[in-house]
Each structure stands twice: as structure tokens, then as C-alpha cells.
């Protein structure tokens, strides 16, 4: 490699070796499974109302995928409280509390809703057909890392049951179940490493006159394969609503299940190694009367299903980068 040089290269037989293959990318890590919501507490005739269950609590990379709290049972004659919505992308809505009244039977609280599962991460980009040069060395065209999937939303908390306020008979409603948390997303797979290339002559910011040479290049190395994205964690079930003395007092609804986390995206395949007779950046190259025998360009690295395969390396006699 010639840097900031003025040179004439003539009448030589130049033979370059083969490029080295790229490393394979790492596999992503699986997402954590969701946390189950807790059950609602019982209400009772001639007694107090039950508390709603707590939603499953889970943080994924600093963001909540927790389930919503279940609604408390209603005091005598009053409706149960509504359940809380879950947290996260597209969370499940909370259930409506059951109506209270002066006579039985009383309706149960509404179940909490379950959200959609988290989306999968986007695959990493393909390694290019050529990387570059830095400090006298070829820099490989690596594939990109797959993106993190989307966490699952938390399930909605269920509504609490209504309370009874009949003549000479009262009772508190049952608590609704808490929503299950969503699962955390899987992380993306690492990109495959770009392969080494084979170059006859390389000039950077140089003035070169290249005539009458025989220039043979070797084969470019094969790009490394992209790693697999990992699956997301499973969403957890919601807690059960209490049913004590139902339907004289309202039963609590069941908490919604959390959504599963999305899988991480696959890593992109590394770029195959180029095979180039004369490569230059900046400066000027005057080339004539040279004979070239180029090796095979390296194939791009594979990528798991849904990913981006690396590009085949560049194969050309003279290339300005």
C-alpha cells in the first residue's frame, strides 16, 4: 500500500494472497418471561369488600411491561372499581366494575383485556461488497446487528364485583384479578464479520503510474454468517377474580394475560471479500498495458430466515473508492 507517494510501477509480476473469511455473528439473548398477576381478594355477605389483585410487575430495558391492577370490590350498594390498564405498547384495557344494587344476583366485574404480542425486531443490514482502508489496513464490510424486538404489553386488570345493600342484608363485592405482565423482547443477533480481500496494488492520496505489469489477485474470503435473533419472553396469565358469596355479591373478573415479547431481528451477513487489481483513493493513477488475472470474489455471509444476506465482494481490475 502506497500513501502520499509518487511512484512508477512497471514490468513486475505481482501476486496477492487470498483474503481471510469473516467471523460469524453472535446469537441474541432471549427475553424474560412475564410475571403473573395476583388474585383478587374475597368480599362477603355481612362483611367488607375485597381488594383487587396487583398486576404483574416487570421492567424490560427500563420500560414497563406490567399488568394493570384489579379493581376493588364495591362497598354495599356500590359498583366495583374498574381495573387499571396494563403498561407497554398496545396494553390491555382494564375491565369495568360490576354494578352494585339492592337485590341479588349481582353481575360480575368485567375481565381485563389481553394486548397484542410485541413485534419482531428488524434484521441487520447486509455487509457491503467493499469496506475501505484505514491506517494501511483493509477494513471489512461487516453486517449489522438485528434490532431489539418489542416488549409485550401488560394485561388489563379486571373489574371488581358490586356490593349488595338489600333490606337487612349487606355485603361487599369481590376483588378483580390483576393483569399479567407482558414478556420482554429478545435481543437481535450480531452481524457477520466482513471478509478480507485480495489486492494487487493499493494507493491512497498518491500519484501512481502503473504500466506493463502482470497482476494476479487471490480469492476474497467468505463473509461471516449473521447471528440468530432470540425469541421474546412469554406473556404471563392474569390473576383470578374472587367469587366468594357470588352472585349475592358480585364476583370479580379475571385479569387479562400479558402479550409475549417480540423476537430480536437476525444479524445481517458480512460482506464477501473483494478481489481488485488496483485500488486507489484520492490522487491520480495512470494505468496502461497491464495484464490482470483476478481470483474469485468472496461470497456474502448467510443470515437466518428474514435476515439480509451479505453482498458478494467486488471483483474488478481498477477501482476508485
PLM regions and their residue ranges:
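Glycine-centric low-complexity repeats
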Residues: 1-321
Amino acid at each position: 500500500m502506497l500513501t502520499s507517494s509518487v511512484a512508477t510501477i512497471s514490468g513486475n509480476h505481482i501476486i496477492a494472497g487470498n483474503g481471510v473469511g469473516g467471523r460469524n455473528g453472535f446469537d441474541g439473548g432471549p427475553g424474560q418471561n412475564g410475571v403473573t398477576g395476583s388474585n383478587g381478594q374475597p368480599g362477603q355477605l355481612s362483611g367488607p369488600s375485597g381488594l383487587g389483585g396487583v398486576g404483574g410487575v416487570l421492567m424490560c430495558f427500563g420500560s414497563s411491561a406490567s399488568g394493570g391492577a384489579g379493581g376493588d370490590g364495591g362497598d354495599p350498594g356500590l359498583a366495583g372499581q374498574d381495573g387499571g390498564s396494563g403498561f407497554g405498547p398496545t396494553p390491555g384495557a382494564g375491565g369495568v366494575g360490576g354494578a352494585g344494587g339492592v337485590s341479588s344476583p349481582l353481575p360480575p366485574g368485567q375481565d381485563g383485556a389481553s394486548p397484542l404480542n410485541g413485534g419482531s425486531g428488524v434484521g441487520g443490514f447486509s455487509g457491503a461488497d467493499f469496506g475501505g482502508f484505514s491506517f494501511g489496513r483493509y477494513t471489512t464490510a461487516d453486517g449489522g446487528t438485528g434490532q431489539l424486538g418489542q416488549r409485550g404489553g401488560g394485561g388489563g386488570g379486571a373489574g371488581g364485583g358490586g356490593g349488595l345493600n338489600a333490606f337487612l342484608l349487606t355485603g361487599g363485592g369481590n376483588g378483580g384479578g390483576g393483569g399479567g405482565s407482558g414478556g420482554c423482547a429478545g435481543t437481535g443477533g450480531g452481524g457477520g464479520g466482513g471478509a478480507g480481500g485480495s489486492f494487487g496494488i493499493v494507493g491512497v492520496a498518491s500519484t501512481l503510474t502503473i504500466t506493463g505489469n502482470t497482476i494476479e489477485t487471490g480469492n476474497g474470503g467468505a463473509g461471516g454468517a449473521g447471528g440468530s435473533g432470540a425469541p421474546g419472553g412469554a406473556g404471563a396469565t392474569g390473576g383470578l377474580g374472587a367469587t366468594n358469596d357470588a352472585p349475592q355479591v358480585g364476583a370479580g373478573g379475571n385479569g387479562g394475560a400479558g402479550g409475549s415479547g417480540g423476537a430480536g431481528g437476525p444479524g445481517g451477513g458480512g460482506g464477501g471479500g473483494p478481489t481488485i487489481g488496483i485500488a486507489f483513493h484520492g490522487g491520480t493513477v495512470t494505468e496502461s498495458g497491464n495484464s490482470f488475472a483476478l481470483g474469485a470474489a468472496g461470497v456474502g455471509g448467510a443470515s437466518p430466515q428474514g435476515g439480509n444476506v451479505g453482498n458478494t465482494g467486488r471483483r474488478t481490475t481498477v477501482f476508485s473508492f
